[in-house]
Amino acid sequence: MNIAANIADDLETGEADTSGHALFADAPRSVSFNKLRKRLLRQVRQAFDDFDMLKGQKRWLVGLSGGKDSYGLLALLLDLKWRGLLPVELIACNLDQGQPNFPKHVLPDYLTKIGVRHRIEYRDTYSIVKEKVPEGATYCSLCSRLRRGNLYRVAREEGCDALVLGHHREDILETFFMNFFHGGRLASMPAKLLNDEGDLMVLRPLAYAAEDDLAKFAAAMQFPIIPCDLCGSQDGLQRNAMKDMLADIERRMPGRKDTMLRALSHVNPSHLLDPKLFDFSTLGVTDPS
């Protein structure tokens, strides 16, 4: 089913939209907000189509950190579900990692208010990260692994087919350049991935969405944002350097982020240097199997 191309809905009129899930009850009624909302919905639907995200899917665990991106992801999925465009059960999950002064009431209160099934899981990964990571080193890698492992466990316990995450265009580009500059390889975040155990999909429906758009969407929707003190307390992260580099390129050459993202879906193995992808003796693409 080509959701992005074949489904017409009232957002296509470009007029202020007053319909949608209950969480949109207090959303702006302006045409500009409607255009933003329409653009994000279209990009999510395009990701569904391009990466066949809905195939065999019945229940998703949606990771909710309390940041703008995961709030936006949940809102857009609920919007599509309300419109009958997402035949998948959604469960929102926040992993309370034991950070000091974490406002424990914010997410359950918000999710209860908008009527979303949810699970708040407590695991003190904060203390583990602080203990294991040497002074001056970055927390991101270990923190991410611990968080992902717990989310996989919850997804299995809830009978979910996939873990759905809020990574966006900039996350994908930053990861590509981190691997390029620091890992010596061409790789990024896949929009759809089977986990190592082979029992869960990892999906990123915001792969085409711009971070600026998600920030505007979050501000307009007045999501109760929770800052990450663990990561936010660190300076000089490699990812921040990549973010600054991409922002500088975009300032000097507008539209380059979209061009770079398109490049990730137009790979020519014969014009690279990897004999595992291209057989230079027969001049044919190598069978990955």
Swiss-Prot record:
Pathway entry: tRNA modification
Reaction equations catalysed: cytidine(32) in tRNA + S-sulfanyl-L-cysteinyl-[cysteine desulfurase] + AH2 + ATP = 2-thiocytidine(32) in tRNA + L-cysteinyl-[cysteine desulfurase] + A + AMP + diphosphate + H(+)
Any Pfam family the entry gives: ATP_bind_3
GO molecular function: 4 iron, 4 sulfur cluster binding; ATP binding; magnesium ion binding; sulfurtransferase activity; tRNA binding
Cofactor mode of binding and number, as noted: Binds 1 [4Fe-4S] cluster per subunit. The cluster is chelated by three Cys residues, the fourth Fe has a free coordination site that may bind a sulfur atom transferred from the persulfide of IscS.
Class of this enzyme: transferase
InterPro entries assigned to the protein according to its UniProt record, in alphabetical order: Rossmann-like_a/b/a_fold, TilS/TtcA_N, tRNA_Cyd_32_2_STrfase, tRNA_thiolation_TtcA_Ctu1
GO cellular component: cytoplasm
EC number: 2.8.1.-
Cofactor(s) required, per the database record: Mg(2+); [4Fe-4S] cluster
Binding annotation for [4Fe-4S] cluster: 140, 143, 231
Motif (PP-loop motif): 65-70
Keyword 4Fe-4S: yes
Primary role: Catalyzes the ATP-dependent 2-thiolation of cytidine in position 32 of tRNA, to form 2-thiocytidine (s(2)C32). The sulfur atoms are provided by the cysteine/cysteine desulfurase (IscS) system.
Subunit structure, interactors included: Homodimer.
Further remarks about this protein from its record: The thiolation reaction likely consists of two steps: a first activation step by ATP to form an adenylated intermediate of the target base of tRNA, and a second nucleophilic substitution step of the sulfur (S) atom supplied by the hydrosulfide attached to the Fe-S cluster.
Protein name: tRNA-cytidine(32) 2-sulfurtransferase
Taxonomic source organism: Rhizobium johnstonii (strain DSM 114642 / LMG 32736 / 3841) (Rhizobium leguminosarum bv. viciae)
Gene giving rise to this polypeptide: ttcA
